[in-house]
């Protein structure tokens, strides 16, 4: 009985001091293989966690570490024209193998940006939030960006430019669709300043 009592005391002490490595239980690893990849452009990211993304090996295999142990969705770019979204339940402190992921023809979104006078603003940035895709920064005088391939689904588009209000819009795309979205950025009535000083564009989220 004395040995058992000591054992339970040790377990309780470890639990109190983090001996169970709680961080590992909250995250895990997700791996799988994308079919028909073009490895030079293929990538996988966790939607809503854009910092969690990885490239893909020549055989289509990938591995993502530090994935939250919960239900989530993978955003997959398989090639220059194909993409997919894959639901997965990641397990804490384990490797979750999602198996093979087949892609479909992706949608392409063309975003045309102007100010209220119809002119092309400077410092235009276009982003599909929470997808892991890189934010596109347009060259001066360029008011159009093309995003894709995008798997079927809905996304939040964010557009910014110097000294204008930010605009956010929700949009949905279908398999293989070519969609054009015209965005007009309104004048920033605050004169380019923002409350916390952290946004060079001075726009307010949500436009």
Regions found by a protein language model. Give the residues of each.
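Hydrophobic loop/turn residues within beta-sheet-rich immunoglobulin-like superfamily modules
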Residues: 37, 67, 101-103, 149-150
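Sec-dependent bacterial lipoprotein signal peptides
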Residues: 1-16
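Short, acidic Ser/Thr/Gly-rich low-complexity loop/linker segments typical of extracellular
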Residues: 48-63, 130-146
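Beta-strand-rich domain onsets/edges
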Residues: 17-29, 38, 94-107
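Structured interaction patches on ligand/partner-binding surfaces of diverse proteins
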Residues: 78-98, 162-188
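Ser/Thr/Gly/Pro-rich low-complexity, disordered linker/stalk segments of secreted
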Residues: 188-207
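Short, ordered, surface-exposed loop/turn motifs in non-cytosolic proteins
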Residues: 28-50, 69, 115-134
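Short Pro-Gly-centered beta-turn/loop motif in secreted/extracellular proteins
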Residues: 63-73, 79, 142-156, 161-162
């Amino acid at each position: 009985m004395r040995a058992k009592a000591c054992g339970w005391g040790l377990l309780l002490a470890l639990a109190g001091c983090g001996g169970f490595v709680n961080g590992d239980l909250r995250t895990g690893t997700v791996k799988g293989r994308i079919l028909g990849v073009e490895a030079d452009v293929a990538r996988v990211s966790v939607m809503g966690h854009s910092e969690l993304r990885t490239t893909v090996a020549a055989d289509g295999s990938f591995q993502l570490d530090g994935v939250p142990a919960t239900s989530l969705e993978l955003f997959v770019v398989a090639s220059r024209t194909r993409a997919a979204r894959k639901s997965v339940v990641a397990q804490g402190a384990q490797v979750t193998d999602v198996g093979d992921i087949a892609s479909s023809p992706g949608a392409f979104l063309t975003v045309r940006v102007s100010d209220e006078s119809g002119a092309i603003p400077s410092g235009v940035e276009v982003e599909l939030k929470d997808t892991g895709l890189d934010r596109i920064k347009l060259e001066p005088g360029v008011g159009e960006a093309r995003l894709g391939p995008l798997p079927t689904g809905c996304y939040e588009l964010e557009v910014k430019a110097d000294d204008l209000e930010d605009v956010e819009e929700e949009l949905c795309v279908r398999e293989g669709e070519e969609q054009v979205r015209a965005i007009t950025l309104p004048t920033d009535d605050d004169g380019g300043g923002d409350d916390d000083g952290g946004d060079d564009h001075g726009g307010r989220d949500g436009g």
